[in-house]
């Protein structure tokens, strides 16, 4: 069975798994349960049923990885981002692994061969999100002091390559203000560490940095080259970039 609805609550996820588990042919075990990204409720179910749980992340951050359930010996957690791997691997060294994202090379070879002569004519093409639709930071109502502090911090980070200073520089006061400004701030129970500073740094400021950097980079490139962007994001801040519709990758 395949679970496609991302909006299922943890309880609904477990109910679906339990129905599949109970409806299997008598005496036929599950080899393993697989998911894209990590779901604590699935890990709990697999641990109780003693079924291997295999997952592979495609996002960063995946805040559910802070759950104490990542420590179970029934988990086989593959993380695509090396910094993500370094952060979480010590919590379960024998069951958390580094595995970059992959693709079906043979399939793409066939796609390229069948589209001969139909390649875009732009000098530079990008496919993907600007993060404008994902950036929760844009909806925060912050004090002038905090807004100025964070603007300066983000400008400093944009000039630094190879290191991330955001989380280490955030003060408790700034973290509290971000948390208070969004009633949907992610604050899970049963975690192995306090997640507030990580969530503020990565789920709010990190997304804002990604949005800012992508828009600035595209605008700078468009001053010198023909640039096309295939996206479904809000592109009003782009200048001289040829905006195309989003593309289907699967």
Segments and roles (model prediction):
Residues 1-91, 106-113, 242-250:
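Extended catalytic core of nucleotide-activated donor transferases of GT-like folds
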Residues 94-95, 100-250:
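Nucleotide-sugar donor-binding catalytic core of glycosyltransferases
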